[in-house]
Amino acid sequence: MSRIHPTAIIEPGAQLHETVEVGPYAIVGSNVTIGARTTIGSHSVIEGHTTIGEDNRIGHYASVGGRPQDMKYKDEPTRLVIGDRNTIREFTTIHTGTVQDAGVTTLGDDNWIMAYVHIGHDCRVGSHVVLSSNAQMAGHVEIGDWAIVGGMSGVHQYVRIGAHSMLGGASALVQDIPPFVIAAGNKAEPHGINVEGLRRRGFSPDAISALRSAYRILYKNSLSLEEAKVQLSELAQAGGDGDAAVKALVDFVESSQRGIIR
């Protein structure tokens, strides 16, 4: 029995594993590759130079691999690469990259992308990320592993959201959120360490304590950013369980181009 509904359109050149399921009225473009056991919901459009891995579930009316919403785009063969075991719900839009960046939009593994999410051109989404309904990512946004973005939030282009961080719902984010930090508001401000999330992911009490100390240095001790960087670097060499996590935070702050929320 065919796994492709008779009303679906699979353009010549598309490469689908024999176990892929395609629902009614869906369209799969000629430059698309889809891995084993992935399902495509009814009326969805998968187009562009798009590669999708295994065991993904793409909901109804999703638009995956569409042209970048960038006026500089001139039909270059830019790409979208999606990993394995992602859930992409109804009416989500994910666009290919642009030549002004690396030319590729990427989505890792095991992500939970809820309805009406937008992932713009050149975004880099890690793994185990949750993007809640109506969260909107502008172009070039980077999201670290295990991050959560609340529903109806807007993220400015080129912003980075650190690993294990959390952005509350209906927030407007215009600068980077460091790893492990909770932020919320319009515009988004820091509100502590994501303690519950870190516990669920197996961070030790000592590591969480070290990150709390790092947060106080960065946000509570009335230090300039340069002064805070010095103290954070010292904390990252304390010889405890939290050294690696604090170092990841320090490296993120040091590499920020738009500046961090403060």
Swiss-Prot record:
Subcellular compartments: Cytoplasm
One record GO biological process: lipid A biosynthetic process
EC number assigned by the record: 2.3.1.129
Coiled coil: none
Entries under SUPFAM superfamilies matching the protein: Trimeric LpxA-like enzymes
Main subcellular localisation: cytoplasm
InterPro entries given in the database record: Acetyltransf_C, Acetyltransf_C_sf, Hexapep, Lipid_A_LpxA, Trimer_LpxA-like_sf
Key words, A-Z: Acyltransferase, Cytoplasm, Lipid A biosynthesis, Lipid biosynthesis, Lipid metabolism, Repeat, Transferase
The protein's annotated pathway: Glycolipid biosynthesis; lipid IV(A) biosynthesis; lipid IV(A) from (3R)-3-hydroxytetradecanoyl-[acyl-carrier-protein] and UDP-N-acetyl-alpha-D-glucosamine: step 1/6
Cited function: Involved in the biosynthesis of lipid A, a phosphorylated glycolipid that anchors the lipopolysaccharide to the outer membrane of the cell.
Assembly, per entry: Homotrimer.
The name this protein goes by in its record: Acyl-[acyl-carrier-protein]--UDP-N-acetylglucosamine O-acyltransferase
Species, as recorded: Burkholderia thailandensis (strain ATCC 700388 / DSM 13276 / CCUG 48851 / CIP 106301 / E264)
